[in-house]
């Protein structure tokens, strides 16, 4: 199974890349973590937020492989504990499909794109900056894998 994070935004601080790479390297090949950065629509284009989200949605669609299971990150999504995320990861793995986590830009994700997803996931009730979302998601996916495989990383 491959875990793909399709995230709008291309110029992240160095600490984000360092943290992302660290968690991605920790995961084994049968649960590989891959980042697909999506070019954001310029906020100076004169387009409405809905038009910008639609343009970003088209770029996200293009970046995803066919047949991937889509999970949108959204503030109104399911709030899972880490253990519940681990159980969900196990179900996704048993289903035999790659999983893509979609992270929107400053205005969020296009409504039609969210509707095409098989689930909505909320990382926190707090508003998080986009660089932090990448790191937090990578860490939680690694932690979920650690729980699933009885790796000692997670101590609860």
From Swiss-Prot:
Its main location: cytoplasm. One of its GO terms (cellular component) is cytoplasm. S-adenosyl-L-methionine binds at residues 73, 104, 123-128. Keywords: Cytoplasm, Methyltransferase, rRNA processing, S-adenosyl-L-methionine, Transferase. InterPro entries: Alpha/beta_knot_MTases, RlmH-like, tRNA_m1G_MTases_N. It is found in: Cytoplasm. It catalyses: pseudouridine(1915) in 23S rRNA + S-adenosyl-L-methionine = N(3)-methylpseudouridine(1915) in 23S rRNA + S-adenosyl-L-homocysteine + H(+). GO terms for molecular function: rRNA (pseudouridine-N3-)-methyltransferase activity. CDD domains: RlmH-like. Pfam families: SPOUT_MTase. Its EC number is 2.1.1.177. Homodimer. Specifically methylates the pseudouridine at position 1915 (m3Psi1915) in 23S rRNA. NCBIfam families: PRK00103.1-4 (NF000986). Belongs to the RNA methyltransferase RlmH family. This is Ribosomal RNA large subunit methyltransferase H. It comes from Bordetella pertussis (strain Tohama I / ATCC BAA-589 / NCTC 13251).
């Amino acid at each position: 199974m491959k875990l793909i994070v399709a995230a709008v935004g291309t110029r992240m601080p160095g600490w984000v890349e360092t943290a992302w790479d660290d968690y991605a390297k920790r995961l084994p090949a049968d649960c590989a973590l891959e980042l697909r950065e999506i070019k954001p629509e310029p906020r100076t284009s004169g387009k409405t937020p809905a038009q910008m989200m639609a343009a970003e949605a088209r770029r996200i669609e293009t970046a995803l492989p066919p047949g991937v299971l889509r999970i949108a990150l959204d503030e109104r999504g399911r709030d899972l504990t880490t253990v519940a995320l681990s159980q969900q990861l196990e179900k996704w793995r048993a289903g035999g499909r790659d999983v893509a986590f979609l992270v929107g830009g400053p205005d969020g994700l296009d409504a039609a794109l969210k509707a095409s997803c098989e689930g909505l996931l909320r990382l926190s009730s707090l508003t998080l900056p986009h660089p932090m979302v990448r790191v937090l998601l990578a860490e939680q996916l690694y932690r979920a894998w650690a729980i699933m495989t009885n790796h000692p990383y997670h101590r609860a």
